[in-house]
């Protein structure tokens, strides 16, 4: 059984009599960490949770060491949703929004009109890859399904949901022909599995554990469930990185910036709200190549 003391995890499963794999994700602590950093309205928090669930599912399908970045951009009330999830299963996220333009019952199309979804794989070694698809589905689940059908040409279905407390997701994906060689049999099996998956409601996914979800959907199928893979919230910001950003300006511009800001420049992390302060002595130390000691003025 799944140990719900571990509230943030993905869990793979496969169908023994079909060329289909699946994965489930549950996020509570990391989702709460992201929402605690900013006072997001409910519709924004919901979409951000769904995007976190999608990133967690996707990072498990990619064989790489590095960072997966999901960005949804639009011209509407939510200009940006952004999630970063590493191959180490560390996740963070943020949103930009215009609170006065967000009604409680808004749809994805209302909140992110003329939107695009960008999926970027940034490996430690190798070339960066990006795929882009329009946000033209009724839900983020539809948009991710469309992305895989169009760009990867792989049978894929997503079910994503979030309620401000918990984010959950279900991924179903076809595998290369192995158990079923006949194309008609493969198509019929895929249609059967996805039709059953489509009966799962958001309330069920948010409230039931993985074993119960799979029994509810596929009690007549041979399903094998693997061990959970844990996830956690982690922000990769640091004083060193902030200092490097100042170094990239050049000495004169960095000194001028400190002077303009009254003797102390402030760099805030947009993801976690960590604040890093640098004065003239810090700037001198940075450009002397000695690094910056961590003072008492690093704040949340």
Curated annotation (Swiss-Prot):
Q: What does this protein do?
A: Redox regulated molecular chaperone. Protects both thermally unfolding and oxidatively damaged proteins from irreversible aggregation. Plays an important role in the bacterial defense system toward oxidative stress.
Q: What is this protein called?
A: 33 kDa chaperonin
Which organism does this sequence originate in?
A: Pseudomonas fluorescens (strain Pf0-1)
Q: Which cysteines are joined by disulfide bonds?
A: 235-237, 269-272
What's the encoding gene here?
hslO
User: What processes does the entry annotate via GO biological process terms?
Assistant: protein refolding
Q: State the taxonomy lineage.
A: Bacteria, Pseudomonadati, Pseudomonadota, Gammaproteobacteria, Pseudomonadales
This protein's record includes keyword Zinc-finger: no
Q: What GO CC terms are in its UniProt record?
A: cytoplasm
UniProt similarity note: Belongs to the HSP33 family.
InterPro entries referenced in this protein's UniProt entry, alphabetically: Heat_shock_Hsp33, Heat_shock_Hsp33_C, Heat_shock_Hsp33_N, Hsp33_helix_hairpin_bin_dom_sf
One matching Pfam family is: HSP33
> For this protein, what post-translational modification is recorded in UniProt?
Under oxidizing conditions two disulfide bonds are formed involving the reactive cysteines. Under reducing conditions zinc is bound to the reactive cysteines and the protein is inactive.
Subcellular location(s): the record lists:
Cytoplasm
Kindly state which keywords UniProt assigns to this record, in alphabetical order.
Chaperone, Cytoplasm, Disulfide bond, Redox-active center, Zinc
Q: Name one GO molecular function term.
A: protein folding chaperone
Q: What CDD domains does this protein map onto?
A: Hsp33
Annotated coiled-coil positions are none
């Amino acid at each position: 059984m799944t140990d719900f003391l571990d509230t943030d995890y993905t869990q793979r499963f496969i169908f023994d009599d079909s060329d289909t794999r699946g994965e489930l994700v549950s996020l509570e602590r990391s989702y709460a960490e992201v929402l605690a950093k900013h006072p997001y309205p409910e519709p924004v928090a919901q979409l951000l949770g769904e995007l976190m669930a999608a990133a967690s599912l996707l990072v498990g399908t990619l064989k790489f060491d590095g960072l997966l970045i999901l960005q949804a951009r639009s011209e509407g009330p939510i200009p940006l949703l952004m999630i970063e999830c590493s191959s180490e299963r560390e996740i963070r996220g943020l949103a930009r929004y215009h609170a006065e333009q967000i009604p409680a019952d808004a749809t994805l199309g209302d909140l992110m009109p003329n939107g695009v979804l960008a999926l970027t794989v940034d490996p430690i070694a190798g070339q960066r890859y990006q795929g882009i698809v329009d946000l033209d589905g009724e839900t983020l689940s539809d948009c991710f399904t469309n992305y895989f059908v169009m760009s990867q040409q792989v049978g894929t279905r997503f079910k994503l949901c979030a309620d401000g407390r918990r984010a959950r997701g279900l991924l179903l994906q076809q595998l290369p022909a192995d158990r079923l060689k006949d194309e008609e049999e493969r198509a019929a099996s895929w249609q059967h599995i996805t039709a059953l998956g489509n009966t799962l409601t958001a309330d069920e996914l948010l409230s039931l554990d993985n074993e119960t979800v799979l029994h509810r959907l596929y009690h007549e199928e041979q399903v094998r469930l693997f061990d959970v893979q844990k996830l956690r919230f982690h922000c990769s910001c640091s004083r060193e990185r902030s200092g490097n950003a100042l170094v990239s300006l050049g000495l004169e511009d960095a000194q001028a910036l400190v002077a303009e800001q009254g003797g102390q420049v402030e760099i805030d992390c947009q993801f976690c709200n960590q604040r890093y302060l640098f004065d003239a002595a810090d700037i001198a130390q940075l450009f002397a190549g000695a690094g910056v000691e961590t003072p008492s003025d690093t704040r949340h």
